[in-house]
């Protein structure tokens, strides 16, 4: 059976990812592994010696002991929080009839823990921002690009609001990771029966290479049973794609994480985070 690895932090973005996972799991005939990672920095319990150095050598023993006790309590609270978040995830999947759910709690750093479980996963899911999204990029958000860069599996980056997936937009530039995404798209049962749009953005509307890439994607999509709407549009990839998503009411964007044309700027460097954070729909990326 296929496995979906869902990274959660209990935030509103993570809640949305549960709904997308519940939609995808039966279409992929997949189980769901829900991973919560407690930041190791919040679990380190200080000794009285360490604390005396930080608050002054003359601090009373009673005060130091109280501070150590508080550190222990904090570690317990963090553990309890993880337990509650994972149990909430299980309860949600129970209500959706998803029975094959595995809860995983690790202490460390998300990027490091993620590698341990990625090998058995077929698809990675995480929210595009984390628990501190109201104030700054949160835990998941801060790790998002590192995970996308490091993952050997397709990554579904979910938006805050769940939107039923009805229309797909595949942004294709012919790059190697785009070809992997094309192969995943045509082979996966997840997207069968959905409306598919294929978009290639070029510097010129009559660019022969861009036309060839679009023809390739269209032919493979048709062979897989899709009836794709094809578009070749001249312009800036980020602006063109964002406008197309809005205009056509697209519910899922698919693209390679690396390309060999200007489309690569969508997912390399600072523009990646900006696009993913500003997107109101989920984005499926393939390295």
Residue ranges of each PLM-predicted region?
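A structural preference for short, hydrophobic beta-strand core positions in alpha/beta folds
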Residues: 34, 102-105, 157, 198, ...
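Structural beta-alpha unit
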Residues: 41-45, 50, 72-124, 223-266, ...
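Absolute protein N-terminus
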Residues: 1-2, 287
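Short hydrophobic/aromatic-rich motifs at helix boundaries and adjacent loops
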Residues: 58-63, 83-86, 115-117, 153-155, ...
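Small/aliphatic-rich secondary-structure junction motif
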Residues: 2-68, 150, 163-231
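Gly/Ser-rich helix-loop-strand patches that form or flank binding pockets
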Residues: 13-20, 26-27, 103-161, 244-287
